[in-house]
Swiss-Prot record:
This is Zinc metalloproteinase nas-38. Residues 26-114 form a propeptide. Residues 535-554 have a biased composition (Low complexity). Binds 1 zinc ion per subunit. GO terms for cellular component: extracellular region. Residues 113-312 form the Peptidase M12A domain. Residues 610-658 form the TSP type-1 domain. Its EC number is 3.4.24.-. The gene is nas-38. Keywords: Cleavage on pair of basic residues, Disulfide bond, EGF-like domain, Glycoprotein, Hydrolase, Metal-binding, Metalloprotease, Protease, Secreted, Signal, Zinc, Zymogen. It comes from Caenorhabditis elegans. The TSP type-1 domain may be involved in modulating sleep behaviors. Expressed in the epidermis, the excretory canal cell, duct cell, pore cell, and excretory gland cell. Expressed in an oscillating pattern in epithelial cells with increased expression during the lethargus phase which occurs during molting between larval and adult stages. Not expressed in seam cells or in the RIS neuron. It is an enzyme of class 3 (hydrolase).
Amino acid sequence: MPSPSYNRHIIIASCFCCLLIFSSAARVPKASKKHLARVKQLLNDEAERHNTLIQSDSVTVFDDIQRNPNTGVHHDELAVNNADEYFQGDVDLSEQQVKIIEDQFTQGKREKRKIGRNPLYKKWDTRGPISFDYAESIPFQTRQKIRSAMLLWQQHTCLRFEEGGPNVDRLEFFDGGGCSSFVGRVGGTQGISISTPGCDVVGIISHEIGHALGIFHEQARPDQERHIAINYNNIPLSRWNNFQAVGENHAETYNLPYDTGSVMHYGPYGFASDPYTPTIRTLERVQQSTIGQRAGPSFLDYQAINMAYGCTESCADLPCLRNGYTHPNNCSMCACPEGLSGRYCEQVYPSNAQCGGVIFATKEVKYITSPNYPDKFPIDTECNWIIAAPIEGRVFMEFEGDFDFLCEDTCDKAYVEVKYHSDKRLTGARYCCSLLPKNRFISFKNEMIIIMRGYRSSGAGFKAKFWSNLGEPEGVSTPLPPTTAPLPEISETTQKPEPTTVQSTTTYTTAIPRRTAKKQFFTRKPITIPLTPLTSSSTTTESTTVSSTTQSTTWLPTEPSFATGETEITTASPTITLFPSLSTILPPINSLAGVLPSTQAPDIINSVLECGCGAWSEWQGECSQQCGGCGHRLRKRECKKEACRKEEKRPCNFSACPDGTNFLINNAEFHILWRGCCVGLFRSGDQCSALETESNPFFKIINSLLNIQDAKNNDTLIAKRMMRGEH
């Protein structure tokens, strides 16, 4: 006969299995509309008090901006959602989070945020991948886009995702009629609503995943008022809460700068009463068309997650240039801001057309243009330039001539971007549409980065002239900015040919296009590319009467080269770096400098294709239990591999069992009830629903019965039984 101790452990294990199964199967409920409305009213009241103090000073900054009637409306989550259903436009709150926020108002602790802090917002356990699933309401095409958005986060951070993984705390993508997510981990199965159509855009999905990982909206940072102004005169009073920041005691900015190019930033016309007047105005006027992009996470969005989850703590610090930092997926190279590449961000990112490169600015005016200017540039063009002045100089730039790109409120598909800040992590001023920018740009230091993108459309593009306030450097000089590690003196040998008249012919070398996630959903093996040395490659920089050629050797993947005909525009080959070589002062440069590392971030998203599984059957039979949320229905599929999941269960019959019912024994199942609900659920009226593990009173009792060794022994076994459907 089994001992009492043995029986006790069997009962405890059974209860724990029930807890795991049902806390993962039923999505965490959102706060009630009544409680959500109460929090919004508190925020509205505070916004009104704050606005009374500042409105007279800030309202004038909107007088000179009116929406171009020919501008297309930029699509984002706010265009899909009913604002009454969400906190800050697309954020779900649990009842516990609502209570904590209300308590903060009561206690007078109002701060601001970027990344969620405990106890209100929790981070995920990174000792393993984050488990996720899809509800039946998510179609196949949308699932592919969700995987693509996850790969963006996975390739640039240390976080990993696993489809159908075993964790109790997990994500479930479903169609809830809008685009929304909780912020951070809330415990159990938490939903991310991706409505189709409407939210099924990779950029919007990456925004909602960003929330789930713990990121708030960028415009709600503590330094908000130093970067943007809110036009409360153009926002209904009931929507003011969407522009307020929430406590610093709930969040951490990690001293990262404000980023107008964040995928988490509102667009300029969100919640506008008058659709032709913005609700958000960037104080740097040239950034107005930058805010609100939904192409994908920015460099600083990735860095925020890497810092929050300690992704580079196990790596040694590298002497990364231009505000790069050690790559979380490859400790031997740097993660580089947009437009830069190389092991230490010492190179310009390769372009995929006849454009880009590194060009020295002098007092003499030079030009760059989009490919084929003034004819149309090819669709999906990517160009990157570094314009460098002498070390103490500045770069000046102005646009002229025809200017033509796809026209939207936010420029995130086809545009030219000017990165003039000394901090190269910051997204620059973006311009699109057909109105020629009238600004003169001046770099903060001696470098300016120009980025041009032509996704989904074609147009004439741009022409820009640039120059420096100083002349050509005479001998040994480098435009490289100071690094985090001391560098020895750098020298360079330049061949100076005899003065001659320049022929207007430039030879280009095709560069490797930027890798994107859409063709790498389930790549598991490292990608390697054969390399060919390009010996003594040269680039010619035109001036009025003199040609100067700088020779260098660059390793790049083998690609054909081609020549262009005559052109009026000076440019440089995108594969040539005019900066001195760092090979003598730093470790050998990665032979794949300029593209993603050959040792790619491991892709551990499970693929139905790998398993060779067929379609799921319909849900079979009646629910195995009549009440309490304990029962389940079953569906099956055929798979080629035994290790793949062939059966799936989902809970059913969530009506509470009659009072006094303490357990259910039926259909070869045994379930313990807690107030009429299966363990892992809690009673709300006559229904059973999910409850966060940390708040579950029955879990606490179970936990107190287990000693430390019991927990260690049972943990893995229970998880395996769960996956086999043994409970």
